[in-house]
Amino acid sequence: MRKSVFITGGSRGIGAACVELFSKNGFSVAFAYGSDDKAAQKLAAKTSALAIKADVSDAKQIEKAFDQARTYFGIPIFDVVVCNAGISASGLITDMSDEDVDNLIGINLVGTINVSRKAVAHMVEAKKGSIVMISSMWGLRAASCESVYAATKAGIIGFARSLAAELGPSGIRVNVVSPGVIATDMNSEYSEADISALAEETPLGRIGLPEEVAEAVYYLASDKASFINGQVLGVDGGFAV
């Protein structure tokens, strides 16, 4: 029987790279996306994945998305869940609006919790499963003008580690991938000069690719990582060392 994966934030960037990689490796793939219908449908057609529009900050929408995807594939659970959906907003804390704060926490942290809760309900019954969450190097390292974003990403790491301890006895593994500066739309707010400076600050001397992060996600989700639980795997070229 084919293995299955549910990926959030799947229409672009790291999420899209994950959709393509898991599909290439024979998985039945469902992915949730927030707004870009055109990109989602194009990716779904390319990979034969199921695209579902859903707001991860809304637990009811996520529950409905899981039910729709499980029914579509005729499966009781997903073998792998990738919590990738996220947004960024940088600036001085005094310049962050209430909406900025609510959106960052709602999508990045609450969204990850919502997706995990809905996935775990079925995984516990089956006594198996793997959850991979996407954090950030800013969840591990201090950065000016990234305070709220960093708080959400650090929160993901704390949540994942505690969840790994909680779910380990049920045969469910929970791990985190912590990307550095990656060539995605999310980093388009940075100027070319900023990107160049970040690349120079990275020991490997460049920024990363979405496909490189996807490979790390796939590894942690695979049987090759069967004894890895509660860990944070940095894919940052050594930036956070």
Model-derived features: where do they sit?
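Substrate-binding pocket helix/loop in short-chain dehydrogenase/reductase
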Residues: L92-I93, S97-I105, N187, D194, ...
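Active-site helix of classical SDR
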Residues: S116, T152, A160
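Residue(s) in the substrate-gating loop at a strand-loop-helix junction
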Residues: S136
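Conserved glycine-rich cofactor-binding loop
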Residues: S11-R12
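C-terminal substrate-recognition "lid" of short-chain dehydrogenase/reductases
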Residues: I172, R206-V235, A240
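Conserved glycine-rich Rossmann-like NAD(P)H-binding loop of the short-chain dehydrogenase/reductase
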Residues: N25-A40
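Alpha-helical segment proximal to the catalytic Tyr-Lys
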Residues: A121, A165-P169, S226
